[in-house]
Amino acid sequence: MQDQQLLRYGRHILLDDIGVEGQDKLLASRVLVVGAGGLGSPVCLYLACAGVGEIRVADDDTVELSNLQRQIMHGTDQLGELKVMSAKDAMWRVNPETRVVPLPERLAGDALLEQVKAVDAVIDCCDNFQTRHAINRACVQTATPLISG
């Protein structure tokens, strides 16, 4: 771990349950976040701040004015922009070392399965039951840990 990383993640490293080994695991981890709205916004930002190595964020929606009071990752400057691109910019601002992969689509079927296979964990921040069920099925099929918000 580099000196700058030791400074950035020092508070994590001090925790007995994390330490240097745990932080190294976070830096090497890959997470898929489905949904970049009200729940996905803080999730993405905290994952980036924690030092997750790669965050794939999937959402097919654009930033609207009505989103701004609850979707903290987006701002007035991003109105009309794809949420995943706004998310990428926001995560880069808090941690430029995190690799962000924007997926501007509603994941389903084989595309969802391929994304789930490519990560260590999935965080479901979507807003509809059909997608939640599909995510759950893909995670069960691939034995990928799932956190549902």
List the model feature ranges, each with a label.
Residues M1-G149:
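Adenine nucleotide-associated cytosolic modules
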